[in-house]
């Protein structure tokens, strides 16, 4: 199983799943699914990256497609 960078990044920022979901305008279930290794749409990835305060160019640091 791949290392879960989204979870580590979220926890390093002291954000709960609910806080990240609210900031990214996605459901907390979506955050859980992604953290458990399920795929998501590119638009969802974009929302999450921006909600974490990162740049779109940092996508590969969070999502290992």
List each language-model region with its residue ranges.
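Short basic helix-loop element that most often maps to the first helix and adjoining turn
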Residues: 4-23
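Ser/Thr-centric signal marking residues that sit
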Residues: 16, 30, 44
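Key DNA-contact positions within bacterial/archaeal DNA-binding proteins
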Residues: 18, 28-29, 57
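Recognition helix of helix-turn-helix/homeodomain-like DNA-binding domains
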Residues: 25-40
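DNA major-groove recognition helix of helix-turn-helix/homeodomain DNA-binding modules
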Residues: 42-60
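A short, Lys/Arg-enriched interface patch at domain edges and termini
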Residues: 62-65
